[in-house]
């Protein structure tokens, strides 16, 4: 994947004459020691990240770790003290104010924790407000605002007012307002933190669905570990202004960089964080491709050659058809029937988004590995009993 957003050796030091801090940084003094000596606050220290196009990249850490400062450096709401912020290879730390406005209008948008909706304006007008300030004509901004509201499921509330909406719906308006400019990059600063847990989960699911359709580059700030694990393709952990580890949720869980990260991830409920798609294994063994010339005899030979009791049938477009067994294929052959007649009732396929906690009974009772499919019924892979147990055992390994 191409790199969409990159930061190199980025610093933010708050206070007058911030350059004074660098000699102490070079001497290895801590954030607290620098503050004591100079009165300067080290917000971000020598951060470097490369964020790929189309990924959800989560930055997390405890309060004061620098994560909210970091996200504001990415669109220059806060000016960096030193370092580069590259969008599509262009260092926005060096561009003019006019060029920066164009970047904010067309390439990058932000969603805050506070909904920040205008109470006297309708949902539609709130959604279009940023475009109005940018000078976009009324017809175009109305069309784009309605499209953004459709994306978040609020098109029927276009003429309602903010006080007529629930908290979750108001945050959807905030998200729609950012989506209306169709940005390449979406910055989200603890956007769901103020919501009730159930609504927060719904919004996380909504974001994942939107991402599947539009593949924007999303930088998501969070202090909620479960949230980060649920939505993040990769996670960066910050401590005292520094990025101490970057990796996939799985990589960080299995190989924490230090005690801070290890403590951060202690007690995470693997069964709630990971879903079927995260552990499903796609293997060519036992995979039967349904074509006009491929019947029960060919399928039976394939399974016997691979020494497998069960197989999984897919057709054109990778669409999952069902499972077969050696016995069901032999029966279909005896009765001179086609491959469809050999399909067995179990195991039923599970949705790729199913949490591991909901798979235990299904996988445990299935006669073979359980097939996993996406929302379009496309084959994702299989989950065996051993695979599920190994995935769930990672929590014990990390906490032991």
From Swiss-Prot:
Record domain ABC transporter: where: 29-265
Keyword entries, A-Z: Amino-acid transport, ATP-binding, CBS domain, Cell inner membrane, Cell membrane, Membrane, Nucleotide-binding, Repeat, Transport
Membrane topology: Peripheral membrane protein
Domain CBS: 282-341, 343-400
GO biological process, one term: glycine betaine transport
Locations listed in the record: Cell inner membrane
Pfam families (alphabetical): ABC_tran, CBS
Family of the protein in this entry: Belongs to the ABC transporter superfamily.
Name this polypeptide is given: Glycine betaine/proline betaine transport system ATP-binding protein ProV
Gene from which the chain derives: proV
